[in-house]
UniProtKB/Swiss-Prot annotation:
The keyword Cell membrane applies. The gene is coq7. GO terms for biological process: ubiquinone biosynthetic process. One of its GO terms (cellular component) is plasma membrane. Its EC number is 1.14.99.60. It is an enzyme of class 1 (oxidoreductase). Keywords: Cell membrane, Iron, Membrane, Metal-binding, Monooxygenase, Oxidoreductase, Ubiquinone biosynthesis. Fe cation 1 binds at E57, E87, H90, E171. It is a peripheral membrane protein. Binds 2 iron ions per subunit. It is found in: Cell membrane. This is 3-demethoxyubiquinol 3-hydroxylase. Catalyzes the hydroxylation of 2-nonaprenyl-3-methyl-6-methoxy-1,4-benzoquinol during ubiquinone biosynthesis.
């Protein structure tokens, strides 16, 4: 059983890094909004933001894979699995949008994935309450990050905005579920360290 689980997660990791993630929900589309041609500068900026979002989803896959494998209860494992499935949709959506913008994922995705996997293992070894608390804090920070992107994306880029908005809705749900399941609030130094690490990732992934 453990071997089957490891093989399944290894397969998911490969799909995350190779850009062939499976999509269980269709790509969100704007409601009744005509397509507007973006300027070259707008396309470049939107692509940078969506690349950052794609990296975030690569990291989410690694985090939740590691946390699922180290979880001590069946309920925690199920929660990490459900979140990972929805995050896999986000991964596919952002990859799809990057292609539409004639851009590419981050060249450093293997590095981001490996780092997030290590962090997920560390969080998981501290117990389910800490691991769920880490999930809740991660989702809160991602929610804030996505809200910032909604204000930064060109108003005419309705395709990217529809994707980001649905991602934000899902992140709020994941964070609340983790808290309701008993996740504890992380100490301030841990939350600050998470923000600092996120800033390094987002500022780098925008370009690379």
């Amino acid at each position: 059983m453990v071997l089957d689980e490891l093989i399944s997660e290894f397969d998911r990791g490969l799909r995350s890094l190779t850009g062939i993630s499976r999509m269980s929900r269709p790509v969100p589309v704007p409601a009744d909004t005509p397509d507007v041609e973006l300027t070259p500068a707008e396309r470049t900026h939107a692509a940078g933001l969506m690349r950052v979002n794609h990296v975030g989803e690569v990291c989410a896959q690694a985090l939740y894979q590691a946390q699922k494998l180290t979880a001590r209860t069946a309920s925690a494992k199920a929660m990490f699995e459900e979140a990972a499935r929805e995050e896999e949709d986000h991964l596919a959506w952002t990859a799809h949008r990057l292609k539409e913008l004639d851009s590419r994922p981050s060249l450093l995705n293997p590095l981001w994935y490996a780092g997030a996997l290590a962090i997920g293992v560390a969080a998981g070894t501290l117990g389910d309450k800490v691991s769920l608390g880490f999930m809740a804090e991660t989702e809160r920070q991602v929610e804030s990050h996505l809200e910032g992107h909604m204000s930064e994306l060109p108003p005419t880029d309705t395709a990217s905005r529809a994707i980001v908005d649905q991602m934000r809705i899902d992140e709020v749900k994941h964070g609340k579920a983790a808290t309701d399941a008993g996740g504890i609030e992380l100490p301030l130094p841990a939350r600050m360290l998470m923000r600092a690490a996120s800033k390094v990732m987002t500022s780098t992934a925008y370009y690379l």
